């Protein structure tokens, strides 16, 4: 299953979206923590 498959584009896109979502949550958490601790 190491061959490139165009059908995997949806899975790659959703996984990238998940990573972006986690990154956004992490950034928001850092901003909120710095805001509350200031």
From Swiss-Prot:
Keywords: Chloroplast, Membrane, Photosynthesis, Photosystem II, Plastid, Reaction center, Thylakoid, Transmembrane, Transmembrane helix. GO terms for cellular component: chloroplast thylakoid membrane; photosystem II reaction center. GO terms for biological process: photosynthesis. The keyword Transmembrane helix applies. Disulfide bonds: none annotated. The chain crosses the membrane at residues 17-37. It is found in: Plastid, Chloroplast thylakoid membrane. The keyword Acetylation does not apply. InterPro entries: PSII_PsbL, PSII_PsbL_sf. It is a single-pass membrane protein. Belongs to the PsbL family. One of the components of the core complex of photosystem II (PSII). PSII is a light-driven water:plastoquinone oxidoreductase that uses light energy to abstract electrons from H(2)O, generating O(2) and a proton gradient subsequently used for ATP formation. It consists of a core antenna complex that captures photons, and an electron transfer chain that converts photonic excitation into a charge separation. This subunit is found at the monomer-monomer interface and is required for correct PSII assembly and/or dimerization. PSII is composed of 1 copy each of membrane proteins PsbA, PsbB, PsbC, PsbD, PsbE, PsbF, PsbH, PsbI, PsbJ, PsbK, PsbL, PsbM, PsbT, PsbX, PsbY, PsbZ, Psb30/Ycf12, at least 3 peripheral proteins of the oxygen-evolving complex and a large number of cofactors. It forms dimeric complexes. This is Photosystem II reaction center protein L. It comes from Staurastrum punctulatum.
């Amino acid at each position: 299953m190491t061959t490139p498959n165009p059908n995997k584009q949806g899975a790659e896109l959703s996984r990238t979206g998940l990573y972006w979502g986690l990154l956004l949550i992490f950034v928001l958490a850092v901003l909120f923590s710095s805001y509350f601790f200031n």
